[in-house]
Amino acid sequence: MEKVFSDEEISGNHHWSVNGMTSLNRSASEWAFNRFIQESSAAADDGESTTACGVSVSSPPNVPVDSEEYRAFLKSKLNLACAAVAMKRGTFIKPQDTSGRSDNGGANESEQASLASSKATPMMSSAITSGSELSGDEEEADGETNMNPTNVKRVKRMLSNRESARRSRRRKQAHLSELETQVSQLRVENSKLMKGLTDVTQTFNDASVENRVLKANIETLRAKVKMAEETVKRLTGFNPMFHNMPQIVSTVSLPSETSNSPDTTSSQVTTPEIISSGNKGKALIGCKMNRTASMRRVESLEHLQKRIRSVGDQ
């Protein structure tokens, strides 16, 4: 509820009389206050129908005679009037009304004065009731209806830019999530490959150690073979490859004797035949001796290998 106060009502000429103030001269602030009240009342008459605000005017007390107290009283009245005008104009004045009133010089002065008073007294802005405030939807609707085509295009362009930026952010987020999953998979594969590499290197190290051990064993076996050969030479005094030669000769001579025994028992064999058979037996023995030389070597080698194996087992 708003009510426009006239200068007579606020100054108190209509409702009360100032005791002993007729003789006082009015200062510049009083004249400015009266001028502001006149301009605000003229602007209120030109505007729309107004409703009374919640400010109730009570019968003012007697105005003090002291000039300083009188100035303080006028200042409080001025603050009340400025608050009422600010509430009215902040609620009902549209941009069209302000553009229409900009042509009037007096209206501009009153608006500037009201703005200055509202800036000087920010505590009066809290007196605006919630019923006088417009909701966000109503303000947006009024803004859309009052916007010109260029503003509409600019708003549409801004909305399209925001939507494209939102889509690009979503695409980037999806791409980053995909890259993170790939990185996690690659890390798992890398860990598996590193584990396999460590296993292979451990196996290689074990194999190399075993190879060195086997080579050392081979060298020791060769040294043992040489020592065994030298020991055999010292004990026998000759090459061990020919120490079984008398046995081989005896085994070779046995078939010749067995082959000659039937010739001696038969009564039909003559002396020249016996001589010729004796010569043939000697030739056979010589051939068998030459043939068995290689056999003796093989047997001696086998015997030596057996002895080396027995020494190695020990």
Curated annotation (Swiss-Prot):
Residues 179-193 are annotated as: Leucine-zipper. Changing S29A: Reduces its activity. Abolishes the formation of the BZIP2-BZIP63 heterodimer. It holds the Pfam family bZIP_C. Expressed in roots, shoots, young leaves, pollen, and flowers. The modification Phosphoserine is found at S29, S294, S300. It is found in: Nucleus. Phosphorylated. The phosphorylation at Ser-29, Ser-294 and Ser-300 by KIN10 strongly enhances its ability to form homo- as well as heterodimers and are then essential for its transcriptional activity. SUPFAM superfamilies: Leucine zipper domain. Keywords: DNA-binding, Nucleus, Phosphoprotein, Repeat, Transcription, Transcription regulation. Residues 94-177, 253-274 are annotated as: Disordered. Transcription factor involved in controlling responses to starvation. BZIP2-BZIP63-KIN10 complex binds to the ETFQO promoter to up-regulate its transcription. Homodimer. Forms a heterodimer with LSD1, BZIP1, BZIP2, BZIP9, BZIP10, BZIP11, BZIP25, BZIP44 and BZIP53. Interacts with KIN10 and SNF4. Component of a ternary complex composed of BZIP2-BZIP63 heterodimer and KIN10. This is Basic leucine zipper 63. It comes from Arabidopsis thaliana. The gene is BZIP63.
